Amino acid sequence: KSLSEYDWLGLNYNYADIEISDVQVPTIYLKNETRTTSRISPSFIRDTRDNFMNPSSGSRHVVRLDLAGLGGTKFHKASYEGSHYWPIIGKLVGMVHGEIAWADGYAADSLPAFERYYMGGPKSLRGYQIRNVGPKDSLGNPLGGNQSLLLNLELQYPFTKGLRGFAFYDRGQLYGGGNDTSTTATTWDLAKMRDSIGAGVRFLSPFGPVGFAYGVKLDKATGETDGEFHFSAGNSF
C-alpha cells in the first residue's frame, strides 16, 4: 500500500513445503528434512532515489519482519537494509549500503537451514565465493548464520547514460550457526568480519542491469583464492 510518493507498506503471506535431500554428512544444523512453513511478512519501504536504475542522489530503506508459526515450523526474522547515494564532484557518485539481519526459532523449533542467512558473491560480500562466508562444518561446507552484518561502499562514475564504472570496499560476516571454522563468534563481533576491495562495471542491457566485478580479499585465509570474478543481473543494492 502506498502511503505517499516515497513510502510503502507491504504485507505478504507465504506457505511452502520444503525438502532438503542428498546431504552426504548430516549434522544437527544441516540434514535431510522436510519442513512446512506458513509465514506472514510485514514490511516498510522508503525510497527517495532520483533514479531506480542509476541513482545519483537519495536513499532507500527497507524494514522487514517475518513470523512463521501459523502452522509448521516456528521462527521469526527481522532485517533492515539501507542505501544512500550522493554526488561528490562532477559526475562522481558515492554510495553506502548496509544490512543487518537476525533470525531464530522459537517454541522449541530450530531455525531451518534454508532460512539461515548466507553471504558471499556479487550481491553481498564481493571477492568471496557465493555463500562461502561465515560458519562452516568440519568439512568446510557453509552452514549459514542466524545473524548477518554487511557494509558496502562504492565510488561510481557514469561513463555514459547506461554504463557506470565503480570501485568498492565490502565488509561483512555471519554469526551463529554452530561449529565454525572461519570465525569462532556466535554473536556480533566487529573484529571478526571479512573485507574486500575491487572494481567493476554495470550497464543497462535490453534485459535489465548487468554487472561484472572483480574483488580481492583483504584477509585471505589459508586455502582461499586471492579474489573472485562476479557476474550479476538486476540491481545490486
Residue ranges and their predicted role:
Residues 2-8:
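Secretory-pathway-linked proteins and extracytosolic
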Residues 11-162, 167-186, 223, 236:
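C-terminal outer-membrane beta-barrel translocator/porin domains of Gram-negative envelope proteins
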Residues 41-44, 201-210, 226-237:
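Outer-membrane beta-barrel "beta-signal"
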Residues 82, 197-199, 233:
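Extended, hydrophobic alpha-helical segments in both membrane/secreted and soluble proteins
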Residues 121, 127, 196-200, 208:
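Glycine-centered small-residue hotspots that permit tight backbone geometry or close packing
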Residues 157, 173-175, 201-209, 216:
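Short leucine-rich amphipathic alpha-helical surface patches
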Residues 165-168, 209-215:
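Conserved active-site loop/cleft motifs that coordinate metal ions or position small ligands
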Residues 180-200:
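A short alpha/beta connector and helix-capping loop motif
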